[in-house]
Design a protein with these regions (language model features):
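Glycine-rich phosphate-binding loops of nucleotide-dependent enzymes
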Residues: 2-260
Length: 260
């Protein structure tokens, strides 16, 4: 843990992501109530809880798909509470989704190349050979980072489910993100695929922080340094993975039948 603390300290003191008193109402229903979270640059955190705890609504507020009813959201010190999603993407925020959004009729390489091109600041200079070469180099590097080099010329529709999830991570890494939201990346994966997912996430560049929502608690606790537990739209517990795993109240809520 000392090495983790040293790494986080070296990345700066300004919070990567800071939520203060975030509440989200749907009519009379409070999906989120007074959520306050601070995530440091390079920090890897899990947000866990049963279905209906508010995890996905939290992600939607961070990405700008939902605007908070009250409270503020800051990204690397900048107030982005009212920013649309594309402005947050421009500032280095990325997200994966529970449901894949891939081009099934294109190859792995084409999917990653298009993602790199879409977030490239030089996207209007594609005819310049230097720009095209740089994008292709980025494409190959990302494919290698998610262990898909051997299938880079295959159609995405031909990939195994686990490989498609790996491809989604590559797309999220396009354009040098500063922070990523992973929405259940282990969903539907076999034990072997989950082990590979853990390898990919733990090997991400140290400056990239992330929050992971995950129903597989074993996977989540292996790839993070801190955990936030949610229940009924509120923060229930926070702590290190070993503290959360051994907490009696968490065991009762999450492992004793409150988790699907």
């Amino acid at each position: 843990m000392d090495r983790v603390a040293d790494r986080l300290s070296a990345l700066g003191s300004t919070a990567a992501l800071e939520l203060r008193g975030v509440t989200r109402m749907f009519g009379a229903l409070a999906a989120l109530t007074d959520i306050t979270i601070t995530v440091r640059p390079g920090e890897r955190r899990a947000v866990l809880g049963s279905n209906g705890a508010g995890k996905t609504t939290l992600f939607n507020c961070v990405t700008g798909d939902f605007l908070p009813t009250s409270g503020t959201i800051r990204f690397f010190g900048e107030d982005v509470t009212a920013f649309p999603p594309y402005e947050r993407i421009r500032r280095g925020l990325r997200r994966t989704y529970q449901i894949s959004a891939l081009f099934l009729g294109l190859t792995v390489r084409d999917n990653v190349y298009l993602a790199c091109r879409g977030v490239s600041r030089a996207r209007f200079s594609m005819l310049r050979p230097s720009v095209s070469d740089a994008l292709m180099q980025s494409t190959e590097r990302l494919i290698e980072a998610v262990h898909l080099t051997s299938v880079r010329d295959q159609l995405v529709s031909e990939l195994a489910h686990g490989q498609q999830r790996q491809l989604e991570i590559a797309l999220a890494l396009a354009g040098a993100p500063r922070f990523i939201l992973f929405d259940e990346p282990a969903a539907g994966l076999s034990p072997t695929e989950r082990r590979e997912l853990v390898e990919i996430l733990t090997a991400l560049p140290p400056h990239i922080g992330y929050i992971i929502i995950e129903h597989d608690m074993d996977v989540a606790l292996r790839v993070v340094e801190s955990v936030t537990m949610m229940h009924n739209g509120r923060i229930f517990k926070e702590g290190a993975p070993h503290e959360i795993e051994s907490d009696p109240e968490v065991q009762e809520l999450y492992l004793g039948g409150g988790h699907e």
